[in-house]
Each structure stands twice: as structure tokens, then as C-alpha cells.
Regions:
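Karyopherin-beta/Importin-beta family HEAT-repeat alpha-solenoid scaffold
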Residues: 1-220
Length: 220
């Protein structure tokens, strides 16, 4: 597993032999074509990282120590495609690690909150999804709760964004996860009717689960 992790990191950080520069003598068209595949190789490595988190579950937290820095770097890239893929990978890893993500709460929280202001809808949607999972899974309640209202205030306007179906669905799921974990820290009477109005979800049907879980929990 260590060898696999090292190979993945070398790809993500562009140090793998398959990513070596073709040199000055390479044809310009070849270089251009090569650059188009550079990101595909890295994106595939990110997919493998996500698959490892699925396979290892909580045990993946040890490997995240290795992947965190290079993946977070892409999450702050100037390229929206790179940001979106990195933030999406981070979100999936949080969900798969479960409460084992707790030691990484501070850094992940800071990044994901920052990406709520991203100009790219896909990146923003992935950040919303990741934040919901972090609020749900992390046991670092002190760190999470001191940012709760800040997160909610940033999410609330997104509940009215009918133009971005996936972002709207992820926002509904995120707020529902926040309510389920800490119901006393969200104005439920104000937000619950708005969440109900968003049903049925239009694109990300997986987010139905946290919404209905939250409703059932409130009724118990």
C-alpha cells in the first residue's frame, strides 16, 4: 500500500517518469497533445485516491497524511477543472473516512469554506457537499461549531439558486446534515419549510438520503 501511495503522489505532483518533459526537440504539436493528457493522468490518480478511501474506510486516514498537501494544492489551482476535481476528491474522502477525518478538520474546514465563494459552480457544489460531510462526520465539535453560523449564512442564499440544480441539491443535503448533527445550532423553523419546497431533488438524488434522515430525526 505504501508503494501504491508513493506512485500516486508522484503522479499528482508531476514527478512520475510518464510525466517527464519531452525535451526541446519534440514537435510543437506533440507537446500540445501531451499537455492535454497531463491533467487526465493526474485526474485519474485522484480517482484512484478516492477508490482507496472507499476500500479502506476509516483506515484511509493514515494515508490521507500523504495525500493531503498535494491534493489541497490543486484545490487552490487557477484552473477551475483542477479545483473541481480536487475538491470533489476531498469531499468523497471525508465521507469514506467517516469520523477518522477528525484530525484533519481544521485544514479541510478552512479550504472548503473558502471554496464556497468559488466562481466555478462545479467547484462550489463540491465544496458544499464536502462541508456537509465534514460537519456530519468530524468529532472536532469545537472547530465545527464555531464556524456553523458562518457556514449556514453562506449556504442560505444558495437555497434560492434555481439556476444550478446540482448546487441546489448539494446545499439542501449539506444543511440537512448540519441539522441532523447539531439541530440546536440551525434555525430549523426558518429553514425546514424551504428544504421541503426543494423536494423532489432535480439532479443529485443521493442527497435525498440526508434530507429524509433529517426529517425523520426531527419527528422522533
Amino acid at each position: 500500500m505504501t508503494e501504491i501511495a508513493q506512485q500516486l503522489v508522484s503522479i499528482i505532483t508531476k514527478r512520475h517518469p510518464c510525466q517527464q518533459d519531452l525535451g526541446d526537440e519534440a514537435d510543437e504539436n506533440v507537446l500540445e497533445e501531451s499537455s492535454e493528457y497531463d491533467w487526465l493522468v493526474i485526474e485519474t490518480a485522484l480517482d484512484v485516491v478516492t477508490c482507496l478511501s472507499v476500500a479502506l474506510g476509516p483506515d484511509f486516514a493514515e494515508l490521507w497524511k500523504v495525500f493531503e498537501k498535494p491534493i489541497l494544492k490543486y484545490a487552490s489551482s487557477q484552473e477551475s477543472t483542477e479545483r473541481s476535481a480536487a475538491v470533489g476528491s476531498i469531499a468523497e474522502c471525508i465521507g469514506n473516512m467517516g469520523e477518522a477525518c477528525t484530525p484533519y478538520t481544521s485544514g479541510l474546514l478552512k479550504l472548503l469554506i473558502h471554496r464556497l465563494s468559488d466562481e466555478d459552480p462545479e467547484t462550489k457544489s463540491n465544496a458544499v457537499y464536502g462541508l456537509g460531510l465534514l460537519c456530519e462526520k468530524s468529532n472536532n465539535e469545537h472547530e465545527i461549531l464555531k464556524s456553523y453560523m458562518n457556514i449556514f449564512q453562506r449556504l442560505e442564499p444558495l437555497l434560492d439558486d434555481q439556476g444550478q440544480a446540482r448546487l441546489l441539491d448539494n446545499t439542501a443535503g449539506c444543511v440537512s446534515r448540519m441539522i441532523s448533527r447539531h439541530p440546536n445550532n440551525i434555525p430549523i423553523s426558518e429553514v425546514l419549510p424551504r428544504l421541503v419546497q426543494l423536494l423532489p431533488l432535480r439532479e443529485d438524488y443521493e442527497e435525498n438520503k440526508p434530507i429524509f434522515k433529517m426529517v425523520v430525526q426531527l419527528c422522533e
